[in-house]
A protein has these predicted regions:
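Cysteine/selenocysteine-centered motifs that mediate thiol-based redox chemistry or coordinate metal-sulfur cofactors
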Residues: 163-166, 170, 251-263
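Amphipathic alpha-helical effector-binding/dimerization core
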Residues: 67-166
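A short beta-turn/loop motif at secondary-structure boundaries
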Residues: 64, 113-114, 198-203
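N-terminal helix-turn-helix
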Residues: 1-86, 90, 252-260
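Short, structured helix-loop boundary elements
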Residues: 11-15, 69, 73, 86, ...
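Extended hydrophobic
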Residues: 173-252, 257
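A structural signal for short hydrophobic beta-strand segments in well-ordered beta-sheet cores
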Residues: 61-63, 110-111, 211
Length: 263
C-alpha cells in the first residue's frame, strides 16, 4: 500500500514516545523511575512502563531491578560505534577534519542537526599540538549555538521574529545583542562561513561552514556542518581567514555529495 506524503510525515506515536524516553534518560545523568519519566513527558505511567520494559528487553535501556529505575543501556553504545564506522557522511567528513586539523592546528568537528533544535557532534579531529580544545563525539548543543548556529540560521533563512525566542535561550559567556547576532547570520549567508570570536566561550574562536543538501523535493537546506575551534589569541588574521576559506571550500565539496538526495 502506498502512503501519502501526509501519512509519511505523521509520526508513529509509540516510536515517538520511545525516542522521547531515550532522550530524557540521556539527559537525566542518573537512573530514574517510571513515574518520574511519565510525569516529565506527560505519558500514561502504564504506557511508559510498557515502553521501558520493551527497551530494556532489547538493551536500549537498563533497569536496576532493586531500585526499579532505568538508565540508557549498552546496546546504544554498539549503535553509536556502528554509526561512526558505517555512516557515509561521517566517513566522508572524517578525512576532511583530519586534514584541516593538521594544516591549521585546530580542533575540527562535524555536526548533524538532531530534530529542529539540537545539534550533535558526530566526528572530530584533534589539533596536533600540546594544547587543544577538547570536544567529545556525541556532545549535544542548541542548534543556534556559536558560528555553527549562524550557519544553520543562515541556511534556513527564517523570519527574525521566529529566531528571537531560541536566540534568547542560548547561553553565551559574552552574549551579543539580537541585532548583532542577526548581522552575524547575514554574514554567514553572504560569505559561506561564520566566525564566533569569544562570544560563546570566552577566548575561544569557532569558524564554521554549512553543508547544503536536498532536504525535500529538491529544496536545498542544511542539517550538517563542519567547524574549526581554537584559541582566539592564536586564531586570527591571515590564519583565521585561511581556516575560514578551507572550511568553506571543504563544505562545498561535501555539499556536492548530498545535493541530489538525502543520505
Amino acid at each position: 500500500m502506498n502512503m501519502t506524503a501526509t501519512e509519511l510525515r505523521k509520526p508513529v506515536v509509540a516510536v515517538q514516545r520511545a525516542v522521547q524516553i531515550l532522550r530524557y534518560l540521556g539527559g537525566s545523568q542518573r537512573p530514574v523511575g517510571v513515574n518520574e519519566v511519565a510525569r516529565a513527558l506527560d505519558i500514561v505511567p502504564s504506557t511508559c512502563q510498557h515502553i521501558l520494559k520493551t527497551l530494556d528487553y532489547d538493551g536500549l535501556v537498563s533497569e536496576d531491578k532493586v531500585a526499579k529505575k532505568y538508565q540508557l543501556g549498552p546496546t546504544l553504545l554498539r549503535f553509536a560505534r556502528d554509526m561512526v564506522g558505517s555512516n557515509d557522511f561521517v566517513r566522508n567528513a572524517q578525512g576532511v577534519l583530519d586534514r584541516i586539523a593538521q594544516v591549521h592546528q585546530v580542533t575540527t568537528v562535524a555536526v548533524w542537526r538532531e530534530g529542529t533544535d539540537r545539534i550533535i557532534v558526530v566526528a572530530k579531529a584533534n589539533a596536533p599540538t600540546n594544547f587543544s580544545i577538547h570536544v567529545n563525539i556525541g556532545s549535544r548543543f542548541p542548534a543556534l549555538t556559536s558560528a555553527i548556529g549562524h550557519c544553520f540560521a543562515a541556511a534556513a533563512d527564517l523570519d527574525p521574529d521566529y529566531l528571537r525566542e531560541p536566540f534568547e535561550e542560548l547561553n553565551w559567556q559574552n552574549p551579543p545583542d539580537f541585532d548583532a547576532w542577526l548581522n552575524d547570520v547575514a554574514f554567514a549567508r553572504e560569505n559561506g562561513y561564520a566566525v564566533d570570536t569569544g562570544q560563546h566561550i570566552g577566548g575561544v574562536t569557532v569558524v564554521a561552514a554549512a553543508i547544503h543538501e536536498a532536504v525535500s523535493n529538491g529544496v536545498s537546506g542544511s542539517t550538517r556542518a563542519i567547524g574549526g575551534v581554537g584559541l582566539s589569541e592564536q586564531l586570527k588574521g591571515k590564519g583565521l581567514n585561511a581556516l575560514a576559506q578551507d572550511l568553506k571550500s571543504s563544505a562545498a565539496a561535501l555539499s556536492e555529495l548530498y545535493s541530489e538526495s538525502l543520505v
